[in-house]
Structures are given as structure tokens and as C-alpha cells.
């Protein structure tokens, strides 16, 4: 199962999944992706 949590450190609109994922990795997650119309960065990890 994969859990998602909105990034606390990511600033601005999320356009590229790779940028979001690298910020999420500094927060202790395995990756991340942009979600939704407004482009929020959500971090993912196995749970």
C-alpha cells in the first residue's frame, strides 16, 4: 500500500514530478508527484 502526504517544504505550483519527488526525499519520503488542478506536491511512501 502507498500512502500520500502533502509536502511541507515544496513552495509554489507543482509542475514537474521530479522536482516534487526530490523535495519529498529530503522530507524522508520515497518519492512524490504533482496532484490536482492547482498543482500541489504530494509525497509518497510505502506504508
Swiss-Prot record:
Instruction: Note whether Phosphoprotein occurs among the keywords.
Output: no
Q: Which UniProt keywords apply?
A: Antimicrobial, Defensin, Disulfide bond, Fungicide, Plant defense
The record's disulfide annotation reads: 3-47, 14-34, 20-41, 24-43
UniProt keyword DNA damage, yes or no = no
Q: Do you know which Pfam families this protein is assigned to?
A: Gamma-thionin
Q: List the InterPro entries hit by this protein, alphabetically.
A: Defensin_plant, Scorpion_toxin-like, Scorpion_toxin-like_sf
Q: Which GO terms describe its biological process?
A: defense response to fungus; killing of cells of another organism
As for what it does, the entry says:
Has antifungal activity. Inhibits spore germination in F.graminearum (IC(50)=15 ug/ml), F.oxysporum (IC(50)=102 ug/ml), F.verticillioides (IC(50)=8.5 ug/ml) and D.maydis (IC(50)=12.5 ug/ml), but not in C.graminicola, B.cinerea and H.sativum at concentrations below 30 ug/ml. Inhibits hyphal development in P.infestans (IC(50)=25.5 ug/ml), but not release of zoospores. At concentrations above 100 ug/ml, induces morphological changes such as lysis of hyphae and sporangia in P.infestans.
Q: Which family does it belong to?
A: Belongs to the DEFL family.
Which protein is depicted? Defensin Ec-AMP-D1
Q: Give the species.
A: Echinochloa crus-galli (Barnyard grass)
Q: What is the lineage of its organism?
A: Eukaryota, Viridiplantae, Streptophyta, Embryophyta, Tracheophyta
